[in-house]
A protein has these predicted regions:
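Secretory-pathway lumenal glyco-enzymes, predominantly type II signal-anchor Golgi glycosyltransferases
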Residues: 1-339
């Protein structure tokens, strides 16, 4: 009875205490549930690329400033093979010979699986010139050109503070002086500059055969791979999305597909003579593809002697201005009067 009287006397306090205790328990359970859900939650795979793209945009607005090994206004990356020593030598002595100090040029070679003799030769060449970008995780072959592109752009984004990159082949001749002058007037963002094609039919045979192209009956618009320029932010975009990018046989076609949904400035320029065979020689050309060693030497000597590219201007094929107002398959009507 004494206990009952005590309970009755203090029932208000007991009720309040019970309510408070219950509330504390509810808050604790809610917090635990929230933390558990937070730890167990994962974004659907389809959302991951967008999250990365948004992160990239934020980083572009407030870019980090980590210390990098190199700094340049313009980087030149030249894809080459382990045994093409003479081509590299000619390029060093011609269009790379008098480059400015803010131009960084490197020859890109995959070294995975190379015989010891080839590795030794490359190491000797590297010791002499210090301009080889050796990729130990890449087997150098035509079939791996697209992977080489991803490897070298990832390295570039991680190791060089730069504004623009010129991608070229070891049979390309470039006017670095003129390219640099024009780049000074261009915004260093969202730039994709070269000679574009939008009506390239999907190859079904030969070394360019694409066995898994499912996007369209034509290749998506792309700058031809003999020489083109990208701004640094697009290289960064490729690097951070590398795990999501599908690779095709042709590296230039692959790049065009990767950048197809991106808001970039596609700048078609007929002064980039970068098709599968040269259109000839024009003194306005900035980049010329499919050049023999003799062609490079002659162009360099003519520039040194006469201040112009061509000993004599020659037109082997007509060129075109890309018409962005029509479907890609109708983009490119060749006409006279275009470099």
């Amino acid at each position: 009875m004494h206990l009952v009287r005590l309970l009755c006397r203090h029932k208000t306090a007991l009720v309040i205490g019970t309510v408070c205790s219950f509330a504390v328990v509810l808050v604790f359970l809610a917090k635990c549930t929230s933390e558990t859900l937070k730890q167990g939650h994962q974004d659907p795979p389809g959302l991951a690329p967008r999250a990365i793209a948004l992160q990239s945009h934020q980083e572009h607005q407030n870019p980090p400033s980590p210390s990098k090994d190199f700094s340049a206004m313009l980087v030149v990356l030249i894809t080459t093979g382990p045994k093409y020593t003479e081509r590299r030598s000619i390029i060093r002595s011609t269009w790379l010979a008098k480059r400015d100090s803010d131009v960084l040029a490197m020859f890109v070679v995959g070294t995975q699986g190379l015989p010891s003799e080839d590795l030794q030769n490359l190491n000797t060449e590297q010791g002499r010139h210090k301009d080889l970008l050796l990729l130990p995780d890449l087997r150098d072959s035509y079939e791996n050109l697209t992977l080489k592109l991803l490897h070298m752009y990832s390295w570039l984004d991680q190791n060089v503070e730069f504004k623009f990159v010129l991608k070229a082949d070891d049979d390309t001749f470039a006017r670095l002086d003129l390219l640099k002058d024009e780049l000074k007037g261009k915004e260093p963002s969202r730039l994709y500059w070269g000679f574009f094609s939008g009506r390239g039919r999907v190859k079904t045979a030969g070394k360019w055969r694409e066995s898994s192209w499912e996007l369209c009956d034509y290749y998506l618009p792309y700058a031809l791979g003999g020489g083109y320029i990208l701004s640094a932010d697009l290289v960064h975009y490729i690097h951070i999305n590398v795990g999501y990018l599908k690779t095709w046989q042709s590296e230039d076609v692959s790049l065009g597909a990767w950048l197809a949904p991106v808001d970039v400035r596609r700048t078609h320029d007929p002064r980039f003579d970068t098709e599968y065979k040269s259109r000839g020689c024009n003194n306005k050309y900035l980049v010329t593809h499919k050049q023999s060693l003799e062609d490079m030497l002659e162009k360099h000597q003519t520039l040194q002697r006469d201040g112009r590219l061509c000993k004599e201007e020659v037109k082997l094929r007509l060129s075109y201005i890309y018409d962005w107002s029509v479907p890609p398959s109708q983009c490119c009507q060749r006409k006279d009067g275009i470099p």
